Each structure stands twice: as C-alpha cells, then as structure tokens.
UniProtKB/Swiss-Prot annotation:
Biological role stated in the UniProt entry: Catalyzes the phosphorylation of pantothenate (Pan), the first step in CoA biosynthesis.
Residues involved in ATP binding: D6, I7, G8, N9, T10, N11, I12, K13, T132
Protein name in the entry: Type III pantothenate kinase
Keyword Transmembrane in annotation: no
C-alpha cells in the first residue's frame, strides 16, 4: 500500500492507496512545531480508525511546502514504516516540462496537481487549488508547464477584513442570500465569496485568451466546491487531485 501526504500551510492531507484505489483519506491541521513522534501518534490513531494495517505500507510520497516539517515526516516514514519517502520537488521526474524562470520555486503540491490534471484531462488544462493561497497552473497540450498565478486565499482575505477593519468581524464562509447584501454579514460574504468567484472568472478568461483556446478548468482544495457552485469558469472539482498526483509520481519513480 502507498501512503501519500500533502503538507500544506493550513492542512495536511493524507491518503492511503491500494494500487490505484484511494482506500482511506484524512485531513488534519498543520502544526509546524510538532515532532515526528507526535505526528506518528496522530497517524497511528487515524490508521486504527480506518482499519489500515501500517505493516502493509510499502511506499510513501510526500509534497511539503512547510520546510520545518520536511525532516519530521521523512523521519516518520523511515522509523515507523521502514520506507524511504519520495519527497517531490521540481527535479523529480514527472514527464512534465517546466517553461518558467525558476522551476525550483514551484511547490510540490502544484507539481502533483499539474500532473494529475494533465494525465486525467490532457492539455491544455488550467488547475486551481484553493488553499492558504489560491494557485492557478497552466499545462499545455504537450505536457509543458508554462506558469500560472497566485492569489490570496479565501480564508486569508476574510481574516484580513476581520483583523484590519475595526468594525468588521469573522463570518461563516457561505453563499449570501443575494449579491446585494442587507447586513454586514451578508456584505462580507458577498464580497469574499462572490467576489472571489469573479476573481476566478477574470483570471481564467485572461489565461484562456493568452492560450488562444478554451480548456478544462480543474479545481481542488477545501473551498473548491463552494466557489465552483458560483461560477461556470470551473469545469470540475477533484477533491483528491494532489494525492492522486503524488501516487502517479511515485509510480513513475518507484524503481
């Protein structure tokens, strides 16, 4: 069985694959000061809940954008599962080519997302990942990663309003009853949720104009479903796109 781990700034996504089938998956809060032993306890409990025998794990693929946790999870895999994890980065063979100024700056999660989307939908394809930041990645028909965009995440945008505007407060990230809000809560929900849908539409339209063609737009991440419901710019939502990308990369490099 293959263990896939996507370590983000806000959440850690964990998946266990039996061949090509995702048999169990979890999402936990990222705690960048936790040690390998602490994550081991957490993972052990999750495996118990999911009925996963840790002795059956014979491979591990990790994407990490939180440098302090890279070593901790490498240690966890070596000591607990007795496997050497594949730590994905821009030098990891994926079959994609990178036509950007500094490939090393690409997050491992974006690489995994790009490969998974390209393998499933072909190219050109645009990938959106709604996380702490929202990333846009563009892959051409011949598997060339040509760039993208980064925008502040939905949560960051809402938190900034709450922290920096004295009379505003935290609100639930849900669709308001109407675009024209009747109270402060609905005003903020309209601006954040529907405004973000407009941001997505604007960037996707501009990217497709530069490509010279329309193409599939694949979204992933915790708030992907919420935004996809508000715009036709998103073609489909793939909740486990990053984990699937890690699986594909591992299979390409397992030898």
């Amino acid at each position: 069985m293959l263990l896939t781990i996507d370590i983000g700034n806000t959440n850690i996504k964990i998946g266990v694959y039996q061949d090509e089938r995702l048999t169990a998956h979890w999402r936990v809060t990222t705690e960048r000061h936790r040690l390998a032993d602490e994550y081991l306890v957490l993972l052990h409990n999750l495996f118990d809940l999911g009925g996963i025998d840790p002795r059956e794990i014979d491979g591990c693929a990790i994407s990490c954008v939180v440098p302090p946790l890279t070593g901790e999870f490498r240690t966890l895999c070596r000591t607990y599962f007795r496997v050497e994890p594949l730590m994905v980065n821009a030098t990891t063979p994926t079959g994609l080519r990178y036509n950007v100024d500094t490939p090393a700056e690409l997050g491992a999660d974006r690489i995994a997302n790009s490969l998974a989307a390209f393998r499933r939908y072909g190219g050109p394809v645009i990938v959106l990942a709604f996380g702490t930041a929202t990333t846009f990645d563009v892959i051409t028909a011949d598997g060339e990663y040509i760039g993208g965009a980064i925008a502040p995440g939905i949560g960051i945008s809402a938190d900034a309003l709450f922290r920096l505007a004295a009379k505003l407060y935290q609100v639930e990230l849900v669709r308001p009853p109407s675009v024209i809000g009747k109270n402060t809560i609905h005003h903020m929900q309209s601006g954040v949720i529907l405004g973000y849908a407009g941001l997505v539409e604007g960037l996707v339209n501009r990217m497709q104009a530069e490509l010279g063609t329309s193409c599939p737009v694949v979204a992933t991440g915790g708030l992907a479903e919420l935004i996809a419901a508000e715009t036709e710019a998103i073609t489909t939502v793939e909740p486990y796109l990053t984990l699937e990308g890690l699986r594909l990369i591992y299979e390409m490099n397992r030898s």
